[in-house]
Amino acid sequence: MARPAAARPVAVAITGGIGAGKSTALDAFRARGAATVSSDEIVHHLLAADEAVRDALVERLGPGILGEDGRPDRSRIASAVFGVPKQLAWLEALLHPLVSREYLTWREQLAELDDPPRVCVTEVPLLYEVGAEDRFDKVIVITAPRALREQRRRVARDDREARLLPDREKVRRADYHYVNTGTFEDMFEWVGGVMAELEAGAGARA
């Protein structure tokens, strides 16, 4: 039997630009006691374990995307779709519904635990771009100056972010906004305050 909504964890999404520090924020929430998962982790699982995904990738992109272990290799997939909008759109259309399914299953499993966490947090890079914000109770946007993000990622400027919603619009639509220009300790302290608010809200629902 499904638990009432009051017993379910507060569902939080973290989003932001490339190199802003989304994964670092997820680590901070994990350290503060939240249940966490990233879209990247879910994609890794799908590529490793879902035969239907493997077959679809080989049919579309060719057997060259397989690694030596016979599983889809993420770097080879990236090379096959980078700079080819049609292929990238196809890949996103294949994976995004599956990622959403896996995430919702994870969230349901958390709610069925004898002692479910009060807060569950997920890193979703394309949250607004794929229209997934309505699946979450709260949204956190992590931003940082462009030069700092490029330094963190060790990549040159390219057109990847041209496809993304501008930071100012993400911030306008979010519940929380953190400018990540400091240390992990700075973020950890900020996350502590957010967790206190989220847990208080979860308690009020119970």
Q: Can you say where each PLM-predicted feature lies in the sequence?
A:
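P-loop (Walker A) phosphate-binding loop of NTP-binding proteins
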Residues: 17, 29
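ATP-dependent NMP and nucleoside kinases share a basic, alpha-helical "lid"
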Residues: 104-152
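Extreme N-terminal, non-catalytic leader segments
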Residues: 1-11
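Walker A/P-loop
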Residues: 23
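ATP-binding Walker
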Residues: 20
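ATP-dependent small-molecule kinase phosphotransfer cores
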Residues: 41-119
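Small-molecule kinase domains that catalyze NTP-dependent phosphoryl transfer to phosphate-bearing small molecules
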Residues: 103, 134-135, 146, 154-206
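Hydrophobic anchor at the beta1->P-loop junction of P-loop NTPases
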Residues: 14
